[in-house]
Amino acid sequence: MRRILILVCGAMLFWTSCSDDEVVSSGPVIPETPEEEYPSVITTDNRGMMVSYDPVKGQKLGALISWKWMKDDPDNAAYDIYRSVDGGEFVKLNSKPIDKSTNYKDASVDISRKNVYELRFAGSGEALGSYTFTPEMAATFYKSIFLNMNDLPDLTGTVNPGENEEDGDEGEGASVGYKVSDAAIGDLDGDGQYEIVVKRQTYSWDPANAGYLPGTCLLEAYRLDNGAFMWRVDLGPNIRQGTHYNPFIVYDLDGDGKAELAVRTSELTKFGDGTIIGDVDGDGKTHYMNMNPSSGAYGKVVDGPEFLSIIDGVTGAEVARTDYIPRGDKLLWVGYWGDGYDYANRIDRFLMAVGHFNSQNSAPSIVMCRGYYKNFQIVALDYANGKLTKRWHFDTYPDYQDYVEQGNHNLAVGDVDGDGKDEIIYGACAIDHNGKGLYSTGLGHGDALHLGKFDPTREGLQVVTCHESPSKYGNNGLEMHDAATGEIIFGVSGDGDDIGRCMVCLLYTS
């Protein structure tokens, strides 16, 4: 059996010009000095057990039982799977311990009967988790959740301008409605079962394009076990709809066993408990979107407060807030962000992440980012006891000029140097766990990257990424480099094109 690592790149040519009833809530002030002690991560989980079954293939393939490997499990952990049929005794299914995977195929399952599966450590009588698989569940391989259609804005007569079909829009002239795009899962209420938070919006604007459609970006939480609606957060008119504008994170940030939601907000954001951010800056206005159709920034938001809000997973209420990375002086936008006040494209490129910068066993930090085409800033914050505390703030200006223009549309987080603390791969550069620059390859901006153990013959992790500008990447339009040092391992010429996509896959050949 031979294993072949394949790197695939795609050359894609891109052109970019590069109320009276308000309940006003205030946000905490962030101290400059972070707390030294962080709470240990608490895990309350039933292993996320799941049984997958394909009714089309039927019993030929059996049922696949899968579960999560937990961070406290020993490296040599081995498991047993037991099954009870129609309330009978539990019988072990595997003939030898399951020690190389976290799944097991039950080839003998009878889908006409109720099957209850238990996961145990090999040789143990104590259940780590269980899952009930019924004949009704076997009838389909997916679960339907009905979206909450109540209290949505009236969009009657609004049609799609047809500029963003690639983001899931249906094209020019199509009626506009609230469609689901991104989603994230997490245990919002601490019961050991996952919930899902979905983003709904009427249109996905690219920051390069001016324009306006009615509607605002919504984040909604649903239970996965029964599809019950939990809460809705309406980001409001000052957070423009679009993939680049509203990334969000669902993660247990304070180690209490319940996941929070972190997202960029502004005045007029409405939370799940009905609270609305009011006129926080006292300027007498709460609506900042440019509504001048003749402006190059029509439909964009270039003024007004911006925040990072932490939202309770159970209620959807805001529990902490701080200022987002500021836009800065408008006169400096062109030189710093790469475009001006009347365009507002590169300034409004946002990313978010989570990293364990203290240790892998401590509560994580939330990471907010702004910019990547030219200068950019990254801030890591810790959330504990209802407060946000700044851990570090990275800025390419003035000390990291070799990091300018090195960001991607995406990032990756992992312990790349083996110190037990996470680093951030930010396109063609890396930021250390302490917020200091680790390295920059200088190969420039790109649209895709992957962090992983791609070369088993080398120590540590590798990064596979593609790049946009031939003047930057030279002979390395697609390349793999050492994640800890930035050393180029090998590269592929881009033939003078924008290499818009890349992928890594492992193929097995006989």
List each model region and its residues.
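Short, conserved, GDST-rich strand-edge loop motifs in beta-rich repeat architectures
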Residues: 199-215, 264-302, 468-471
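Conserved small/polar residues in nucleotide/adenosyl-binding loops
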Residues: 508-509
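Beta-strand-rich modules
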Residues: 109-124
